[in-house]
Design a protein with these regions (language model features):
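C-terminal alpha-helical interaction appendages
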Residues: 5-92
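Compositionally biased terminal segments
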Residues: 1-3
Length: 92
């Protein structure tokens, strides 16, 4: 658990106190988790992964498709990010 926040595996991020976060915080935290998962898969730093995902429209994709993407496994979300980025000129 980082910074008192955890992903419950059912599409919700929870605070350590158990309170449900605002929708914006959920989206931000989900994006952070996806960036870190992408970084882990491709052996990048978090900053490198974010820059790559931003440049090749992965971040935009997550923002536009949060309602669907957050219901998938993180592995599936990273697969989707990989596809989006490759379709926009990325190499991963």
């Amino acid at each position: 658990m980082k910074n008192g926040v955890y992903y419950n595996g059912q599409g919700d991020f929870k605070m350590e106190t158990g309170g449900v976060m605002s929708e914006l915080k959920k989206k931000i935290n989900y994006t952070v988790v996806c960036v870190n998962e992408f970084a882990d898969r491709y052996h990048l730093s978090s900053k490198e992964a974010f820059t790559y995902l931003y440049d090749y429209r992965g971040i935009e994709f997550l923002k536009e498709n949060y309602d669907i993407e957050h219901t998938l496994s993180l592995a599936e979300a990273v697969d989707d990010l990989t596809t989006i980025c490759r379709n926009n000129g990325g190499r991963y």
